[in-house]
From Swiss-Prot:
Name the record gives this protein: Pyridoxine/pyridoxamine 5'-phosphate oxidase
EC numbers, comma separated: 1.4.3.5
S-S pairs: none
Cofactor annotation remark: Binds 1 FMN per subunit.
Binding site for FMN: 62-67, 77-78, 83-84, 106, 141-142, 186, 196
Gene this chain is encoded by: pdxH
Alphabetical list of PANTHER family matching this protein: PYRIDOXINE-5'-PHOSPHATE OXIDASE, PYRIDOXINE-5-PHOSPHATE OXIDASE
Catalytic reaction(s) noted: pyridoxamine 5'-phosphate + O2 + H2O = pyridoxal 5'-phosphate + H2O2 + NH4(+); pyridoxine 5'-phosphate + O2 = pyridoxal 5'-phosphate + H2O2
Lineage of source species: Bacteria, Pseudomonadati, Bacteroidota, Bacteroidia, Bacteroidales
Length: 214
């Protein structure tokens, strides 16, 4: 069955983004927009789409939750041996996209990823709920499993193993930090004349900024 969606559209008219709103580097604006998303109680305000690619250019994306924006790096956590973990190990060039429908806003980031220091991953892992820590230990993320019962049984066994004890971070799980080289801010506007501003990192570590056509 064919599906046609050409009649589904809406106008974006809630906000604007002008040159006077910009900051010398993109980081203050990133902080402001993330705070706006949290304060507006948008659905999953820290959700971010992570785009990776194999060395020969085959892309894949998935949504994760940003856990920190620290030292001008975007930090999230996952399994090092997952599909994204393997792709980032082989090709560190990644992109991130934040989309807040309620604010009619989007941030797109391009940069290079690195593995976060182990002590920082340990510190974050210790803050996770008990069941989330157990789940991180037993999930062979992105690999085929016989069925849901397999992962449930593994979870139950690991839960019993660490009952009343500290659940240690597995060696296969930890943080990733993305250092940006390009950041685009997109604000929806009427008649599809959206506001777009692109920051690009210069060789001297300063940032250029240009308005882009919608």
């Amino acid at each position: 069955m064919d599906l046609h969606f050409e009649n589904i559209r809406r106008e974006y008219d809630k906000r604007s983004l002008s040159a006077s709103d910009l900051t010398p580097t993109p980081f203050d604006l990133v902080t402001r927009w993330l705070q706006d998303a949290v304060e507006a109680k948008t659905y999953e305000p820290t959700a971010v789409i992570v785009g990776t690619a194999t060395p020969d250019g085959h892309p894949s994306t998935r949504t994760v939750l940003l856990k920190e924006f620290m030292n001008n790096e975007f930090i999230f956590y996952s399994n090092y041996e997952s599909r994204k973990g393997q792709q980032m190990a082989a090709n560190p060039h990644v992109c991130l996209t934040f989309l807040w429908h309620e604010l009619e806003r989007q941030i797109h980031v391009e940069g290079d990823v690195r593995i976060l220091e182990p002590e920082l991953s340990d510190a974050y892992f210790a803050t996770r709920p008990y069941k989330s820590r157990v789940g991180a230990r037993i999930s062979p993320q992105s690999r085929p499993i016989p069925g849901r019962s397999f992962i449930v049984q593994e979870f139950m066994k690991e839960s019993l193993k660490y009952a009343g004890r500290t659940v240690p971070r597995p060696d296969t799980w930890g943080g990733f930090a993305v250092k940006p080289v390009r950041i685009e801010f997109w604000q929806g506007r009427e008649s599809r004349l959206h506001d777009r501003f692109l920051y690009e990192l210069r060789p001297d570590a300063s940032w250029s900024v240009h308005r882009l056509a919608p």
